[in-house]
């Protein structure tokens, strides 16, 4: 992390200007845009432009320049077959790349045009296999530069040759570290921190953008957020990508309001930006901010109604309005534009779940996992779907995968605990509920699950301890039925143990609920009778108004289970 601060910002800007030129010449439009936005963030950094432009103009000049100029115009107009045809005999790295890349994009375009509801099998793509064979031949002959290696890695990845693809993409990152597309393709192949740390990556400042991206992908939120803060301090504090990644990191830390404010800042800086606005729409959906989501959908449609992000935003808008048919239509539209669009597959699965179309949900979630195996939402969705289908063993497997990806998300841990409980794996369920308490119970149900399970097991001391912790935050616990049951249980528990002050306190609480009001009256009568007997036998009259039994609880040294056991202090050791 420390070496981030030592970067020569002028050198960074020079690298950006050179890379923008190189990527633009090769038709790598998304990377060109990404680099240009980074460069714009450094617009106040002054350079000797004569040196920079002279360096850029020293590109190779060859007899293929006229062919390149013609082919590049065809490429820019998406006439990929024509571009590939006219460059077939070219051998210089730049024009050769344009030929191979045109063939690749032609195949991708035709695949999308011919796509049905079932995505095509990449292993049956003869054009892709032929392209990969040509790239392999060039690679063996040492003819591939950093950009050619990138394309070779992409084709290997498409053909599911994962290990070879990883090696080739790492090689590409050494030869051309400024190509962001290479880093993103490599990121999709990394499944855990161990694999990330085993890679031999170039010692280049772009590596830090990649590492920050990977930290978020691997749910290493604190490291990722710290690195993005460092990048902002380098001069990228207004860069839309860095801000969006920061918002995503903040969202992962469950600070949705702060994440929304960060996206509002991005819109203020760049009002026509649609990049990452699908993520923003997800946050508005979670917070049920209908007006803001409607405004975002309207604005996105006006900017570009056929953008992936727009389709996703409008789909979320209709989903929030419970118009699931229209939501499905827009998510399908997004997938028609890009079958690898992860967010749309996951959201489509959610919509099918709402429509009780379990087959559609399973297919969508599986496709999301094919695109990115780290998408915990898809694993979690599959767990829910198989639960509905009364297939608990499948559900348990998918919940385990979701929990491994999000080990500190109480929702994943709770779902796993419930799955264990349904299969009578009680000790595993208890561990999960304790874990959910320890990591911060988002939904506020872990304690009640723990208490209820202990009550079923007849472990009354443990149950009372959990119920005691549960009722201490009664304003958070909105479910009146659960709260009233907890108060009734604690009343009966303390009554059996002749702890009349506490029993009286909880019985008074029971009077506030219609469900327990009558029972509370009966319990209070029992408490009064017991008190009378105590007074008769001991002839001691206590002034009940002097102390509040609950406030005074900490000062007493009795056997109250809340003092013996706190679920929040136990550790979690999952069963393999």
Kindly give the residue locations of the regions a language model identified.
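Residue-level recognition of tetratricopeptide repeat
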Residues: 63, 92-94, 145, 179, ...
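Position-specific recognition of the canonical hydrophobic site in helix A of tetratricopeptide repeat
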Residues: 75, 104, 157, 216, ...
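Conserved structural position within tetratricopeptide repeats
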Residues: 140, 173-174, 233, 265-268, ...
